[in-house]
Amino acid sequence: GSTLYSTACVYGGPSNTLDDCGNGNSAMAGGAGTAAGASYAFDSGLTVAVGYTGAGSSTAGLMTKEGTDVFGGQLSYATDSYGASFTYANVEDYSDDDGRIFYALNGYWTPSETGAMPSISVGYEIGEADGLDDTYQWFVGAQWDEAGPGTFGVAVGTTGATTDVVNVNKGINDPELLMYEAFYSYAINDGMTITPLIYTKETVAGSEDLTGVMVKTSFSF
């Protein structure tokens, strides 16, 4: 599924929350076990992809009523300076045996010359299900590819799909929670890259927000 998708996003932050550029459910980023997919890229910059991921139950296999299956597809278009993509997924047993359909739009723009102007990536996803509140998530990221010897990026977005509904009487507590992050990636040598990141993640009312630092080290041979 998502490994063959070409989501229109040029933001390269290393966190596992905002790295999906706002389309984590529609792009099947989480996976469910077994996966399959196919994609085809046209010379015009258009790419078409389909994907499947699923997990059987203890008594039944894939693509059965007892299992969990996700079917989806993506249409994307990319050029050197801009791109857009539409992603769709039908998720069975998304929450408490309720299925949900997700749609996402993503886009990016990159300046003709690197410098003071960053590249911009955005994403917005909605989830629908009969008799349930719609969910949504969003993402905005900016990245400077030539910031001194490395790449600098900042982003903000929801921490996942949310209904933004809080109803104490019904026992619903699903507010919009945001995450903010900034990273700087630079090469130590030809085979090693260091990427420190600082982030703040909002939590539900009554809990302190989470702030942390992580460092990603990448090697190439």
Question: Where are the model-predicted features located?
Answer:
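C-terminal closing repeat unit and adjoining cap/tail of repeat-based domains
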Residues: Y180-I198
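Short active-site-adjacent structural elements
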Residues: T7-C9, T162-V165, M192, E202-S207
